[in-house]
Regions:
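Catalytic domains of carbohydrate-active enzymes, especially glycoside hydrolases
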Residues: 13-36, 55-59, 95-104
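Glycine-rich, proline-tolerant flexible connector loops at the mouths of alpha/beta enzymes
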Residues: 34-50, 219
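Acidic/aromatic-lined carbohydrate-recognition and catalytic surfaces
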Residues: 65-99, 103-123, 127, 134-145
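An N-terminal, globular interaction/scaffold subdomain
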Residues: 45-68, 85
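Conserved beta-strand edge residues that scaffold enzyme active sites
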Residues: 36-37, 70, 110-111, 214, ...
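Extended, charge-rich helix/loop segments that form flexible
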Residues: 111-114, 118-188
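Histidine-acidic metal/acid-base catalytic patches
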Residues: 1-6, 11-13, 54-57, 74-78, ...
Length: 366
């Protein structure tokens, strides 16, 4: 069975792209979804899941991958209340298993999710893309939060990990995380996963951690999943087939020293979900997200896809952040999640995959 192509969808009324639009993209079989109205720590109830399931199944898609069931801060910090939220997370897993969910993507980044300094940065050809200016990410987390919040308020659009409810409590959160060292965060992640694994085995669901984005500490907050060494540590720390990776090529390659294809070859059996994203690097450490075509960035998309193909990857894959094209912009497009560039990216990925299939067939014929 080949890899299964997915598309991240933010839901009716929350995403300008419809399921009807997605149905017209060749090769997409899986909708990557979530209950985006739920706060970390809340239980996803069966009736809430059923509503989304009915929408997705009406168009013939599966809903095997959830991105994300976010982790409550008390779990990451290691507070005594974490056990209550872990029990809620277990119930989410049980409820999701009733609908055939196979993979839960999540992250363990303190306070912030993925971080960029410009959500619609001109890239020179008329399109825009997510951009990271390294010298803007210093100690002033408030300026960054205000930028994101000004966008969400103006366009009535929220981002996972940057919810207004969380941003209103930033000072409290930074105080709560102050004692949490990198080693303590590792300990808290291990505690969380060891508590979940029996439920994951019972429900046949894989927990697939997303790489930290970008892969270095920001605002004094530790990041864990940043390179090959940390991935080795993570997988050996809880050595269970249900403890897996969401391997994001763009998150890792924001650091050009990371060889994503090598990581794929080493850990393919523990990659449940793959994100394919291309990055263009600047000499000063800034980076811009780029089109998926290999030559448009320095991530090595062809070699990454070849690594997955050589390993016989049968998991789920999706195009990650794309550019905004053809009149897409603030107000009608989620940053990084436009319709056109991701659709183009899928066709590029499938074209490379089909060629690799054909080369294998010809090799077998001799």
């Amino acid at each position: 069975m080949p890899m299964k192509m997915g598309w991240r969808w933010y839901g009716e009324g929350n995403d300008p792209i419809t399921l009807s639009d997605i149905k017209q993209i060749p090769g997409v079989t899986s909708i990557v979804w979530a209950l985006h109205n739920k706060m970390p720590g809340e239980i996803w109830e069966v009736d809430e899941i059923q509503k989304v399931a009915d929408q997705i199944h009406a168009y013939g898609f599966d809903m095997d991958v959830v991105e994300s069931v976010n982790v409550h801060d008390d779990i990451k910090i290691g507070l005594p209340t974490r056990d209550k939220y872990i029990e809620n997370y277990k119930q989410c897993i049980r409820n999701l298993s009733k609908f055939g969910v196979k993979v839960i993507c999540y992250n363990f980044m303190p306070i912030f999710d993925w971080t960029r300094t410009d959500l619609f940065h001109p890239v020179g050809d008329g399109s825009t893309a997510l951009f990271y200016q390294k010298d803007m990410i210093q100690d002033d987390y408030k300026a960054m939060a205000e930028y994101i919040m000004s966008f969400t308020e103006k366009y009535n659009m929220t981002f996972p990990g940057w919810e207004p409810e969380r941003m209103a409590k930033l000072d409290e959160l930074f105080k709560a995380y102050a004692p949490v060292t990198k080693e303590k965060l590792w300990e808290n992640l291990k505690y969380f996963l060891e508590a979940l694994m029996p439920t994951c085995r019972e429900c046949d669901i894989k927990m697939a951690i997303h790489m930290d984005d970008p892969p270095w500490d920001i605002f004094g907050l530790p990041r864990l999943l940043v390179d090959a060494e940390s991935i080795d540590r993570f997988l050996s720390m809880v050595d269970d087939e249900n403890n897996c990776l969401t391997l994001c090529s763009g998150s890792l390659n924001a650091n050009p020293n990371n060889n994503v294809a090598e990581i794929v070859r080493k850990h393919c059996d523990r990659i449940a979900f793959a994100h394919i994203r291309n990055i263009h690097h600047f000499p000063n450490g800034d980076f811009s997200e780029a089109a998926h075509r290999d030559c448009c960035g320095e991530t090595g998309i062809i070699e990454i896809l070849r690594a997955y193909h050589d390993c016989g990857f049968e998991g789920y894959i999706r195009p990650d952040h794309g550019r905004q094209l053809w009149e897409e912009g603030p107000g009608n497009c989620r940053p990084g999640y436009g319709k056109y560039d991701r659709a183009l990216g899928i066709q590029y990925m499938l074209g490379v995959w089909d060629l690799l299939d054909r080369l294998d067939e010809e090799k077998k014929k001799g």
